[in-house]
Amino acid sequence: MGCWLKQPQGITTMMGCWLTKSRENILDNVIVTDAKLKISMNFEDCAKKIRKVACQFEVKSCITDIDDQKVLVSGDFNLHKLVKTLKKKTGKKIEIVTKNEKSSEDKVDDTVQNEDSKDEIVPQNADKPETSIMEVEFDIPFLCEKYEKDFGKVISKCTGVETYVVDLENKKVVVIGNFDKDELSRKLNKKMHQKIKKAEKERQEWESEMMLREAEEEKRLADIYEEIDKDRNVSLNPITDYEKEMAKHYYMFSDENPNACSIS
C-alpha cells in the first residue's frame, strides 16, 4: 500500500498507457463499410500515393477529389489502421468527416424452430434496406466548361449524392453516393437536351445575323457601284451645262494600256 502511495505519478502514467492501448485495441476491431476523409492534396501525385496506401487494405474503391480535398473509401476495412498508415506515409493531418461502421448484427442470424421441429435461419437484417455507397459514371457528349455549373447543379440537387468529379477532357461525370441512378440519368439527359436545343437556337440566330450582315454589305457595295456608274455616265454623256463643265475635268485611261494617251 505504501508503494502505491509513494508513486502515484508512475501509476497514473501506467494507467493512461493501459487505457490508450485498450482504446487502440477496440478501434483495431472496428470495421467500417465506407468513410469520407479530409486530407490536404495539392497534386495528383499526392492522390496517387493515398490510393496506393488504401489499396493495401480491404477496400473496394478509393476516390480522391483534389478540388474538395476529400477521399471517399468504401468496402469492409479497418478505418483506424488506414488513417494511422496514411498519416505515417503522407505526414499529413487527416480528418474523418463521416463513417459507417459495420454492425455485428449483420453477421448474426436468429435460429427459429418451425412447426416441423426443424431449425430455420432468419437473418437479422431481412427488413433493413441496404444502404451502400456506389460510384456511377455518366457520359455527357456536350460537357464543357460553359455547361459545367449547370450539370453540377442537377447532380447536387439529387438526393443521396455524396460527391462528384467532373472530367471535361473525357466528357464524363463520376457521381458517388447512395442515390437513384436512373432518376439522375433522366435528369441529366433532360438537361443535356435543353442545352442541345439552346445551342441549336443560338446557331440559327448566328446564321440569321450573318445572312443579314451579308445582305447589308451587298447593298452597300451595290450603292457604291451604282454611284460609280452614275458618275461615269455623266462624264461620258453630259447633258446639262453643269455636267458638260464637270466632264472637262475627268480623265479616263484604258485598262488594256495604262500608258496610252488620256482622253479629256
Swiss-Prot record:
PROSITE patterns per UniProt: HMA_2
Metal-binding is among the record's keywords: yes
Function: Probable heavy-metal-binding protein.
GO molecular-function term, one example from the UniProt record: metal ion binding
InterPro entries: HIPP4/7/8/17/18/19 (IPR044577), HMA_dom (IPR006121)
Organism: Arabidopsis thaliana (Mouse-ear cress)
Propeptide boundaries: 262-264
Name listed for the protein in its UniProt record: Heavy metal-associated isoprenylated plant protein 17
